[in-house]
A protein has these predicted regions:
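Intrinsically disordered, low-complexity, charged terminal extensions of DNA damage-control enzymes
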Residues: 1-157
Length: 157
């Protein structure tokens, strides 16, 4: 019997974005084989999380490491056509192990004042009270719990 393969690490940013009505942006996973049909906070895959930390650690950055392309926040704003006020919060990293993948998820939170509905894809603004009507996979539940722990427990909403 072949030895069990170690899950491949994947690094993702979960963008937890709230509108002025207190609803959160969720998207239905339509195309992935993994977790198809579940609703999720927008996720952006990155190579790893070390790039950002390295920039903060060293004031002088070598020429070739300057251009990482758009940040996850910039990618999100382009993909969803929203102007987001990103919050400067440090959330606990979320980890979730599937049989063949290990997700490392960093939460990035933001708020929008001007928002729109999405006609072209399965994206909705949903209040936390309604979350139970939408199937969430376990990693998304962990993301929401991590968000609540840090953000809502600090008395902000």
């Amino acid at each position: 019997k072949a030895p069990k393969k170690k899950p491949i690490p994947m690094y993702l940013n979960a963008l937890v974005v709230q509108n002025k009505d207190g609803k959160f942006l969720l998207e239905k996973n339509e195309d992935e084989k993994l977790l198809k049909g579940f609703w999720h906070f927008p996720l952006i895959e990155v190579d790893d999380f070390s790039q950002e930390e390295e920039i903060n650690l060293f004031h002088q950055v070598s020429e070739e490491s300057v251009n990482f392309g758009p940040s996850p926040e910039e990618s999100f704003q382009q993909d969803y056509d929203l102007k987001v006020d990103w919050l400067d919060y440090q959330f606990d990293q979320i980890k979730h192990v599937f049989s063949h993948r290990k997700w490392h998820v960093k939460i990035i939170a933001g708020q929008v004042n001007d928002f729109h509905e999405f006609k072209d894809r399965e994206v909705r603004w949903i209040s936390p009270k309604e979350f139970s009507h939408y199937p969430f996979a376990k990693p998304q539940q962990k993301i929401w719990q991590g968000y609540e722990r840090t953000y809502l427990d600090n008395g902000r909403q």
